[in-house]
Amino acid sequence: MHFKRALLSLIACAAILSACSHRVASKNIRIGLSMDSLQLERWKRDRDAFNHRAQELGADVLVQSADGNDALQVQQAENLLTQGVDVLVVVPHNGEIAASIVDSAKQQHVPVLSYDRLIRNSDVDFYVSFDNFRVGELQAKYLFDHVPKGNYVLIGGSPTDNNARMVRDGQMKVLAPAIDRRDIKVVADQWAKDWLPSEALKHTENALTQANNNVSAVVASNDSTAGGVVQALEEQKLAGKVLVSGQDADLAACQRIVAGTQSMTVYKPIRPLATRAAEIAVALAKHSQIESNSKVNNGSKDVPTYFLMPLSVDKSNIGETVIKDGFLKLEDVYHNVPRDKWPKGARE
């Protein structure tokens, strides 16, 4: 009887020790990557580049995509924690709701890296992104430099995405003085749920109707919303006549730029972002010191932050940026353009 009781106690202790030491016993660092969605082209690039660098550093990556579902993302993050990840990297669909993910991770002493989008009102450990305020500045400055007066339409991103707010703040820093002088009139100011092209299409159609098609520029906050904007302009035979901004240098957007229906995009080189994020994630797992170059207040704390700088891209420099970097291939970007209109040296 005593032997049986002792054996059961030994088994129970072994089980507890096994559960508690799972992370320590694992040969490689395990990174949990919780992604909002993989529907947009750019996020697949993020995932692949992140995986590549993490594997170079000897880490294993477990990826979950929530398809824009808040409850599912929380559930998936809990599952990653249950699998014993050493660090959690989160691209939140909703920066407020994702705070519960951080709470759960903290209870298990797992550090959390907020990737590209800030998790608000939480004890998140680190934030890595592009300077989204600067993204908005670049968009608005490009349009304002080309059309300093006229009717503008503002199409923001998802209202639940903190990045969308930061982009808008950057846009308004440039545009506000001209609006105050009445050089620019904002005829519509809308937000596109989940950054959907269909939302941008609807809002732009309504704006064109209200303004009797008298619109000079549309400040679209990313390339997917720009796609919806251009579709609405095409319906009114205004594509190429109204300036349209964007962000992400998606293939479809770059094709529109060289075709002349989208004016510019903001190029955020994904590989450097994902590479830096993987390096930070590994450092967090090892409890190593991490270099930051900024801080961002998320409503709860000043979060150590590493910002990368975005670039303004239009038809004049697309070859020296997006294509030269290998982000997109020239033949893909110019696919819809007659070959005799391709850049010199690429027509053969």
Each predicted region: which residue ranges?
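Bacterial N-terminal signal peptides
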Residues: 9-18
